[in-house]
Amino acid sequence: MHIVLISTPIGFLGSGKGGGVELTLNSLVSGLLSLGHSIDVIAPRNSKLYKSNEKAKLHFVEGEDQISWQHQNYNSPVTIPDNSLLAAMLEKGLDIAKKADVLLNMSYDWLPIWMTLNVEIPIAHIISMGSESSVINNLISKVYAKYPDNFAFHSKIQADDYPFIKKPIIIGNGFKLDNYTFQDTVKGPLAWVGRVAPEKGLEDAVFVANELG
């Protein structure tokens, strides 16, 4: 398949601003390339993919970042800045996707989900967060009712944040183990880095810490 990926509109890949989406995108690209798929990635200027993903074609877009929904109130309205990075990435992605099989959206935002109902090009979404916004939650419910196979989540507990999702498609976060060094020791602290949210599995991390003493 020819797949076009839309990156997060919050910082360029490699900046760290996009949080776990950066790792997820690179891991996903690695897996898809290994399966023989053709991959285009639409991302903010200055973005970099892992060297192992050099077969993917990277397209740069400029514009103003979106405000993260993690930093807004649950009932905040949708805002799109002038010279929107998200809108520019979607415009670029949709143009390339005219000759592709599917457009895969990695951003948790209103506009790409809304466009699923309004363009002929298939748009799929990996929802990376729990329910952070009333307006996005309601839109996902509306689009999911028509296109249930166009949404995937990272875990069952995360999908449970959306009560209308009965049989979620789960795409776990894969890790390229070559990028990590195994520490064969039980001494020293176990560090936890992550947002306090159900899908992060903080309870599991605490359980492991307790088991290790």
Indicate residue ranges for each PLM-predicted region.
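Catalytic cores of nucleotide-sugar-dependent glycosyltransferases that transfer UDP/GDP/TDP-activated
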Residues: M1-G213
